């Protein structure tokens, strides 16, 4: 028995509904990841763990980073399992631009990381006698944007989307960008509390993510 046109429409509707559920799950997973990542980094939650963990709290940031990496790998693995349907057939120059944008983002992010104390950034435990105060830095890429690591990340994920041109890569780019933008608000509140007028003046002079633009 052959399929008529109405049968084909019905099958397409089922497939589209199934795909939509997969993409909605992807969005939900990004939201959950962002919530966990932010909640565990909040001062209130960290104070609770500090009371519970005692001297072992010095491993908190290390465990936090390990958990973040494991969850991110799981999320990216799920994305790779989604149907890889291209939103458009990209021209060769689009692919070249996308690759260039991606690697510019990666290089900016790597350059930005060099401005951090990597042991502290990764969460390597320090002796209890080590000073905990951080230094207000404005050198290197921080002369041009306040959050160069986030600038590089945004360029990389959008370069990846332009190259892949799939719905799941678009969802990832949007989710990462929105999360970064929201995260900057809370991060800068913390920086203002920590550095006061010096950071307020710095924020007034220097762009957030893109020089002379934003």
Tell what function each PLM region has:
Residues 12-15:
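Cysteine-centered motifs
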Residues 22-36, 131-214:
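Hydrophobic transmembrane alpha-helices
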Residues 29-43, 74, 102-124, 173-191:
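Transmembrane alpha-helical segments that form the membrane-embedded catalytic/substrate-channel core
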Residues 38-55:
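Membrane-interface helix-loop junction between the first two transmembrane segments
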Residues 48-51, 80-91:
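Membrane-interface helix termini and inter-helical loops of multi-pass transporters
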Residues 51-67:
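Loop-to-helix transition at the N-terminal end of transmembrane alpha-helices
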Residues 65-79, 102-105, 146-156:
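Core segments of transmembrane alpha-helices
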Residues 89-103:
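Interfacial segments of alpha-helical transmembrane regions
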């Amino acid at each position: 028995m052959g399929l008529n046109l109405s049968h084909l429409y019905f099958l397409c509707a089922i497939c589209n509904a199934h795909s939509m559920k997969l993409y909605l799950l992807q969005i939900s997973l990004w939201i959950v990841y962002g919530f966990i990542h932010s909640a565990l980094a909040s001062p209130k939650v960290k104070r609770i763990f500090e009371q519970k963990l005692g001297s072992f709290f010095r491993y908190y940031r290390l465990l936090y980073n390990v958990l973040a990496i494991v969850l991110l790998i799981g999320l990216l693995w799920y994305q790779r399992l989604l149907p890889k349907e291209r939103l458009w057939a990209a021209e060769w120059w689009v692919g070249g631009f996308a690759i260039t944008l991606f690697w510019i983002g990666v290089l900016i992010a790597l350059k930005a990381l060099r401005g951090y104390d990597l042991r502290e950034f990764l969460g390597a435990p320090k002796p209890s006698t080590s000073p905990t105060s951080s230094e207000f830095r404005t050198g290197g890429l921080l002369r041009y944007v306040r959050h160069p690591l986030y600038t590089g990340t945004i360029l990389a994920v959008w370069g990846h989307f332009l190259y892949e041109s799939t719905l799941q890569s678009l969802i990832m780019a949007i989710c990462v960008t929105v999360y970064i933008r929201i995260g900057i608000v809370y991060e800068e509140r913390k920086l203002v509390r920590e550095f006061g007028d010096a950071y307020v003046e710095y924020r007034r002079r220097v762009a957030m993510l893109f020089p002379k633009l934003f």
